UniProtKB/Swiss-Prot annotation:
Binding locations of substrate: Y110
GO term, biological process aspect, one: tRNA pseudouridine synthesis
GO MF assignments: RNA binding; tRNA pseudouridine(38-40) synthase activity
Subunit structure: Homodimer.
InterPro entries, per the entry: PsdUridine_synth_cat_dom_sf, PsdUridine_synth_TruA, PsdUridine_synth_TruA_a/b_dom, PsdUridine_synth_TruA_C, TruA/RsuA/RluB/E/F_N
Annotated gene: truA
Keyword Isomerase on entry: yes
Keywords in alphabetical order: Isomerase, tRNA processing
Pfam families according to UniProt: PseudoU_synth_1
Stated family: Belongs to the tRNA pseudouridine synthase TruA family.
Protein source organism: Borrelia duttonii (strain Ly)
UniProt name for this protein: tRNA pseudouridine synthase A
Active site positions, chain numbering: D52
PANTHER family to which the protein is assigned, alphabetical: PSEUDOURIDYLATE SYNTHASE, TRNA PSEUDOURIDINE SYNTHASE-LIKE 1
Amino acid sequence: MKKILAEIAYDGSLYHGFQIQPTKPTIQGEIEKALEKINKTKVKIQSAGRTDKGVHAKRQIISFYIKININLKNLKTAINSLLKNDIRIIKLKYVSNEFQPRFHAKKRKYTYYILNNENHYPWEEYQAYYVRKKLNINRLNTMAEMLIGLHDFTTFSCIRDQTNSKLKEIYLAKFKKKNKFIVFEIIGSSFLWKMVRSIVGTMIDIEIKNESVDTFIKILKSKNRKYARTTAPAKALFLDRVFYE
């Protein structure tokens, strides 16, 4: 059997996250069903990360074994023909049996889209968080810079997150203006469950209330979940890229 790496994209709006669940539609479940039809036996996929309910991906990485003899171009076409239009295989390639999408990943990049313009089309809110009040991008970036480096992110973790260590290293965190949108980009070693959404929601809350930007670092350093503010909606978050070098 050969091990294959797949780069995939998906709209997570109608799914209960990436990870398979027995009675609910998930990204993993849909892909494994498609692979089983092609492979004529069950296929278990591994992923670089498990996105939450409603979260999307531009370049998620998965791997799986397949026993049938088929070239990658035809395999890609076959898988996509069995998937719904909101999940796509973008690229396939062979990898060594030792490759693990999650454990070999060096960094992950997430992007979060904030719609910050009253003059917008209704559908522009579909995958963005609409904030009516005009946001000060300079203040947001001052808070974002406080994330750079190694920090304990207990404040921005979720009670249900059973990860032993809450220490994560952040390499990049910045807000950029893009037409009607403010886009938050963050690159880190890995992320806790709902961590990015909690960070974004807290920064926006501080900005809307015109509190001192130093409030953010105090909240981060408190290592206490009760001091985090609103958790921003899932619909605006994308797993953008996974780095292996």
